Amino acid sequence: MDGNPDVHGKTIRETLHRHEQVIVSTYFAECGQLAETLSQSANRVGVSAALAARIDSYSAILPGAQALAPARHDRMPYRVFFGQIGERLKATYEGRPNAYQNPDELLADVGCAADSLLENRGRHAGYFLVRRFMRRVRTFGFHLATLDVTQHAHVHDQVIAQGLGLADWPAMAPEERLRQLRDLLARDQGPTSALDAIGRRSLWVFEAIAQARHKFGGRAIGEYIVSAAQGPEDVLAVLLLARWADITDKRTGESPLDVAPLLECIDSLERAGDILRALCREPAYRRHLAARGNRQMVVIGYSDTNKEGGIAASRWALQVAQVQLLEAAREAGIKVLIFHGRGGTPARGGGRTENLVEAVPDGAIRGVLRLTEQGEVVNQSYGLRPIAMRTLERTFASVALATAHAGEKPPLPPAHAAAMQTIAARSLAAYRELVFGSAGFFDYFRAATPLDVIERMHIGSRPAARAGGDGVRALRAIPWVFAWTQSRHMLPGWFGFGSGLSAALEQHGDDVVAQMVAHWPFFGHLLDDVEAMLGRTDLTIASHYDALAGDALRAQAEVIRREYALTVAHVLRLRGSARLLDSDPTLQRSIKLRNPYIDPMHLMQVDLLQRWRKTGREDRALFGALRATISGIAQGLQATG
């Protein structure tokens, strides 16, 4: 799915089956603990008639539970009952008769025990433990964790092209595809041409979603995310394919999917409000939304927008898109939930969650926050129980405060918006001039970073580059950021920001920009992130990597050095500091302590790269050593992609 050929309908089913086994095993263990704890004797404490009836019923159909319980436990009804629940959970795990068909059946059993405890002097004799078990069942069901499904919009177009026998479908104007989709949905027309294996496999995903929801509950599957969405036609395409897969409601014709467009380029973010308005004007989709509670999720992508336009233009496009989405949703009378698809590093939107919450536009967070947590940073935030609890506490506190004070943020001064627009526009121009407009830049990038090693390491769930393209545009965001991190250029985290600040200071004045730093959390946190990336940048180390590119490509390195010097000068001026990160001494000290250990690994990596490339990239021993340096530098910097 979305670039990973190993993810398909079978993967969804197998993943949820494994989820079920994990959570059912956990429930089974908790039942054993409850059976040990709730040892009340029927000679002293009564039980409800409903519980007594259930125990008798299960005694007849669950002989295994009866055989496992010692005879002396016969007069301990709660112990007997939770043993019976455990037997049903065991049957659920093994797929035997008498298994729980859904978590509601388990909840009914546990609830019966809770009611009996309340009725029979058990409020302080196990009731809390049983209620806690009920909360866990309500939270995790039999699905444990909700799966979102992501597919690229182009894949949907290819399947529709096959099904309609229209080879030029992907190349059609968006307006024409939208018109035809509108007509196909109105006529409920199925495919008129046979699908190949890839097309059938795409429809099997929809069938797997329907089966998963039937077996594991409605919460087993979350959003169906359409990546690289450009307009309403990319969302309507999903509704059409759902009909072709025959998973729609036979009575109403509505799809059981929550479809979320992923806006991951600057152009689509700039049109975010118009896209949502156009989508809400489509009769078929408006009926679909009504059936889903008039709730629409939109995913905004931090990673590819940064690769496309640099950090300042990316962050501003994301901010403006959120304002537009909130306004469009208000006009349409629906609720929009913004899903922040961010990466692990500041260049890809990473950082403290509370900073993200504080920086979003007023009203963008009302009791709910959806964001991605990248695998490479999960251990930092959740690896130890105390750290995980601290992460959750800080996240909950920030969301609670944002919700409580929604509608109270002062309006953004026009002067601040104008200055930020200037920063974004000028930084975008500087970034694109280097990355996309400079001859030989991609050759320089490949030579002056260990990208060729990273590509062969097969890190992550998808190939390093998208099929059918070349250059920076085809490269995925993770290897793009990771390669610059390894060489200590850290370019995606700061390049262009200095040029943007120069333009803003010249056109709008020092006072306006200083006010933005002091009173606008969005800009303050952007400045924090840029300064942190500048603090990790080491152009002395980077110069050794630049030497690998040779004299013919040295002009690229000079442009980077000039922009770095400009950006550092402006950041220090705005901070009123003599050194980078004087305002964050903890991070400053951490970098200073780590550098002596990391720097030798960089020098080793440069030497190994030179030797490995001379062998035609065939020497496996050198490649193994390069892998070790990449891992060591990543651990030392605590940063990947």
Regions found by a protein language model. Name each.
Residues 65, 143, 148-150, 155-157, ...:
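Acidic, glycine-enriched catalytic cores built around paired aspartates
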Residues 5-7, 14, 21-150, 157, ...:
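Extended, highly charged clamp/arch subdomains and adjacent linkers
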Residues 77-78, 91, 145-148, 152-236, ...:
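Active-site cores of enzymes that catalyze phosphoryl transfer or operate on phosphate-rich substrates
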Residues 7-38, 245-429:
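Catalytic or ion-translocation cores adjacent to nucleophile or general acid/base/metal-coordination motifs
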Residues 1-9, 19, 154, 230:
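Extended, well-ordered protein cores
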Residues 237-238, 348-353, 461:
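Flexible, glycine/threonine-enriched loop-and-boundary segments that flank and lead into catalytic domains
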Residues 4, 134-135, 142-146, 219-224, ...:
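Beta-sheet entry/capping signal
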